Each structure stands twice: as C-alpha cells, then as structure tokens.
Amino acid sequence: KYAGGNNAGVEYLDPKQEDFLVFINNDTIVSSDFLNHLINPFLSDPNCIITVPKILYAMDINKIWYAGGLINMWTGTIDHIGIRNYDAPRYSFLMETDYATGCCLCINTSDFKKLNYFDTNFNMYCEDVDLSIRAKKMNRKIVYSPKSIILHSVSQSLGENSFIKIKNKLTGQMKLFWKHASGLQI
C-alpha cells in the first residue's frame, strides 16, 4: 500500500525537519537535474508546500502524462493536465496546481509531518490528492515545476486498464469525495 509504505519509510529514515522528501514510483526514470528543479520553487516561494515535475510517458517521451492537476468537487473529477497530449510550450511554465501526483512529489519533512503523513485509509489511489487537499487547506501552494522532468512507465504494476486498478481508483475517489466534499457537493 502506497500510503502506509511511504509513511513507514519516513518513520524508519527519521529525516531532519528541514530535509526534503521525494516520493517517487519505482516505474520512473529521472533526468539528471530533476531534483534541483524540484527544490527550486521552495527556495523562491515560502508558501510552496509541495512540488511536482513534468511527467512524460516513458514509451513516448513526446507525450505528457502529468503537467499539473485539476480537482472539481462539484463534478467529482480529478484530472491530469495535458494527459496524452504532445508536449508543448503551454506545459512549460511554472504554475500552481490543484494536486500533486504520488508518481513523484517533493515535500519538506516538517510539512509532511504537520499534514500527518499520507492517510492510510486510502489503499491505493487518491492518497496523493488527499494530501494535496489538506495542504491547500493550510493556504499553501502546490507548484508544478516543468524543468524537472521524469519518465513514467504507466501502470506497470497493475496494468493500465485492469479490473483491480479501476476498482482501486473508484474506491479511492469515493473515499476522497466523502472525506472532502461539502454536503452540497455530495
């Protein structure tokens, strides 16, 4: 389980409060300078709480998998910006985004602890969106840093359209909206 495993890893490592944590999937390939570009937004904006890279498909490095994210509590949708589109200049600007994908995100240890880690009630899927919503409720920014680039071999663990993946995704989304949507939005 993503949430519990990452939480246990942080507890085991016991990093210093000022250290940065990078949570990254095992089916990714990073560029040589991705970490510098992932840290830079923290250095220039004290309201930055989480950063995320531009994520391209490993099988087609010209196509976007993630260039930021959008959450709509009214429609119950969680969308990656740019998904399956060819990379273009419009995906190359530093910007605030609604959520950070757990495929790769960076956060300061003290902030991760203030957020009380990943919520382990999410088995797989939406624990990253939940963390992002809680971060935004602290009036902090999640920043998409497009100069930080990684490649993602999508769904290598579960299969892109497997029943298990779809079931886990829907279960995570239901838990997420039940936890965060207002009575009018449900």
Where are these regions (language model features)?
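Glycine-rich, basic loop-to-helix element that forms the pyrophosphate-binding segment
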Residues: 1-15
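Short glycine/serine/threonine-enriched helix-capping/active-site loop
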Residues: 23, 50-54, 81, 145-146, ...
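Short, flexible, basic/aromatic active-site loop/helix in glycosyltransferases
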Residues: 72-98
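A short, conserved beta-strand element in the Rossmann-like catalytic core
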Residues: 1, 28-30, 56, 123, ...
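A short, conserved alpha-helix in the catalytic core of glycosyltransferases
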Residues: 98-149
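Active-site-adjacent helix/loop segment of glycosyltransferases
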Residues: 136-186
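Short beta-strand-to-loop acidic/aromatic patch adjacent to the donor-nucleotide binding site
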Residues: 17-29
